[in-house]
């Protein structure tokens, strides 16, 4: 299975931590260079070309813009290289040692029957209907709410459709509720949260600080 890990090229320490933690899975992976949104947004003329509306009106933070561009680039890589499906993670995510065997078995089952046109969220704090069972054991449809792009499975068809709506950037990369309708893809949820957030307090997050400042502004809009 192809595994992409989104990470800023300059963030050597986070890459080293991820590599150390992920080694327990014995899976090969590739770091995928992310986009530094802070650097990009220092030149509004450059960032505005990528946005649905000017930066100051968009209610998006520079970090969110960089994150969206990074995930878009991964979708493009999947499509351009005709990769049938992939696991996408971010560099602050990890798989707990106690979950490794179950996680690998789950990936094998997924590979044997990849749901078409789908994104499967492997993260926590996601709401879904337990009645909406799928053919893949432990995976449910009827996604309701929840964010996070630090761990998910995606097939080629879903990546292709997401590419058509991500640019110009209007939403955060993890606005799954909006993306599932605008792109016409299926958002599914794994009951067991195999991919964990290694920075729950967001002490090392480039996005969280500015994102919290935006919450009140977004609620007004």
Question: What is the predicted role of each segment?
Answer:
Residues 1-89, 93-221:
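An acidic/histidine-cluster motif and surrounding catalytic segment
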